[in-house]
């Protein structure tokens, strides 16, 4: 499978996952999430879903537990929406890049304040 196709599938999967999680999954533990990236392996067997959660650490943990519990439902919904022979296995990962970017931005602002 080509890398470009895996990237296209990942982009489409990102859109579909946002819709499924926001509108179909009814678990109250799922907080306000943003899917930042979906990386699909070239053979389409695994999709790593990178996301951020607005809230404290407990809300982040609760959201990931709820997503793990709803993984089967999410995968079946994804399968009915996308034309794939095999729906990739979903692996949810917390994306630390937003926090890291905010930390760097704060450091830059602090440096400008000192000048």
From Swiss-Prot:
Keyword field contains Nucleus: no
Keyword Cytoplasm among record annotations: yes
GO molecular function: ribosomal small subunit binding
Pfam families: RBFA
Gene3D superfamilies linked to this entry: 3.30.300.20
GO biological process, one term: maturation of SSU-rRNA
One cellular-component annotation, GO: cytosol
Keywords, alphabetical: Cytoplasm, Ribosome biogenesis
Assembly: Monomer. Binds 30S ribosomal subunits, but not 50S ribosomal subunits or 70S ribosomes.
Matches recorded under PANTHER family: RIBOSOME-BINDING FACTOR A, CHLOROPLASTIC-RELATED
Function: One of several proteins that assist in the late maturation steps of the functional core of the 30S ribosomal subunit. Associates with free 30S ribosomal subunits (but not with 30S subunits that are part of 70S ribosomes or polysomes). Required for efficient processing of 16S rRNA. May interact with the 5'-terminal helix region of 16S rRNA.
Name of this protein: Ribosome-binding factor A
Record organism: Staphylococcus carnosus (strain TM300)
Gene: rbfA
């Amino acid at each position: 499978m080509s890398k470009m196709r895996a990237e296209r599938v990942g982009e489409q999967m990102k859109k579909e996952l946002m819709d499924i999680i926001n509108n179909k999954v009814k678990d109250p533990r799922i907080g306000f999430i943003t899917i930042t990236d979906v990386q699909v392996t070239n053979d389409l067997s695994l999709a790593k879903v990178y996301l951020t959660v607005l809230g404290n650490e407990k809300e982040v943990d609760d959201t990931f537990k709820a997503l793990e519990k709803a993984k089967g439902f999410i995968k079946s919904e994804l399968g009915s929406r996308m034309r794939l022979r095999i729906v990739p296995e979903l692996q949810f990962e917390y994306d630390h890049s937003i926090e890291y970017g905010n930390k760097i931005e704060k450091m830059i602002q602090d440096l400008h304040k000192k000048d």
